[in-house]
């Protein structure tokens, strides 16, 4: 019964209001570090990069590959979600769309999301213009580009994937960033399906890939016709192991394994 409830909470895909961007289930262990990976080329004009992240599902933490998507509205930016430490557990703050980039925990997701704001491109009228110093763009296909190498210095190279708590990023939102969340729009149905599909593939589980997922990024979101390669379903053993780490807020549960691994590079 508990496993079914957890699955329903994480894999249902309603359209939440801004007040629902906070996931209510706490996890007693921290997510792994953000892996280092290569961004696939932008497939077409006006596609925006949504960086990969660690989500939680019935099988535990799993990697949601970074991917290119269209914004639900021209002029909107993506603010990534993040894990935050509160009430003796880690809680997920969902990402959202909006006219500005808000607070995403100070997490360095790479590719222009270096902890604050976004420097990988900007909207000029109805066209998104890409900063080729950061973003992987084929300029024979996409012509709205510029190059600003000065923003590369904003990359702090820290790959910790959660805010607050022991070993976490100690950033706090500005009043401007907090206001941005209030104007936020939920992830698209395409994004939700992408996340849900990744969570059903055992190869994406942190307990299986040990923080180094085989598929870190894809050009297009997972869909009914674009399934994960080498797909393997999550097992009942995976679900049972994950349930041990679902915390009850305020229960006094303490964080476990919440120090990021040293040397966040794939094994040679």
Regions found by a protein language model. Give the residues of each.
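Bacterial N-terminal signal peptides
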Residues: 2-12
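A short, compositionally biased domain-edge/stem linker segment
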Residues: 9, 33-36, 251
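Sec/Tat signal peptide C-region and signal peptidase I cleavage site
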Residues: 15-19
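Low-complexity, repeat-rich tail regions
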Residues: 20, 69-268
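Cleaved targeting-peptide boundary
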Residues: 20-27
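N-terminal targeting signals for Sec/Tat export/insertion, comprising classic cleavable signal peptides
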Residues: 28-50
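General zinc-binding finger modules coordinated by cysteine/histidine
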Residues: 46, 50-71, 83-84
């Amino acid at each position: 019964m508990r496993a079914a409830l957890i699955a329903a909470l994480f894999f249902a895909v309603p359209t939440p209001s801004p007040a629902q961007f906070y996931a209510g289930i706490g996890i007693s262990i921290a997510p792994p570090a953000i892996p280092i990976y290569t961004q696939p080329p932008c497939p077409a004009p006006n596609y925006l990069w949504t960086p990969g992240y660690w989500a939680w599902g019935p099988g535990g933490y799993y990697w949601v590959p970074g991917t290119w998507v269209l914004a639900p509205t021209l002029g909107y930016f993506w603010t990534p979600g993040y894990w935050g430490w509160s009430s003796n557990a880690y809680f997920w703050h969902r990402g959202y769309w909006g006219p500005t980039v808000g607070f995403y925990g100070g997490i360095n997701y790479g590719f222009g999301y270096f902890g604050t704001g976004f420097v990988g491109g900007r909207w000029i009228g109805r066209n998104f213009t890409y900063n080729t110093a950061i973003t992987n763009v084929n300029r024979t296909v996409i012509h709205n580009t510029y190059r600003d190498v000065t923003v590369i210095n904003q990359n702090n190279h820290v790959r910790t994937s959660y805010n607050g708590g022991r070993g976490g990023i100690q950033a706090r939102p500005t009043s401007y960033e907090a206001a941005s969340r209030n104007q936020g729009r939920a992830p698209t149905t395409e994004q939700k399906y992408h996340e849900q599909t990744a969570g059903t593939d055992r190869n994406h589980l942190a307990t299986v890939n040990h923080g180094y997922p085989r598929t870190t990024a894809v050009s297009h979101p997972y869909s009914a016709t674009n399934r994960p390669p080498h797909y393997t379903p999550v097992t009942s053993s995976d679900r049972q192991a994950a349930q041990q780490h679902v915390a009850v807020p305020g229960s006094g549960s303490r964080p476990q394994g919440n120090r990021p691994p040293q040397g966040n590079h794939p094994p040679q």
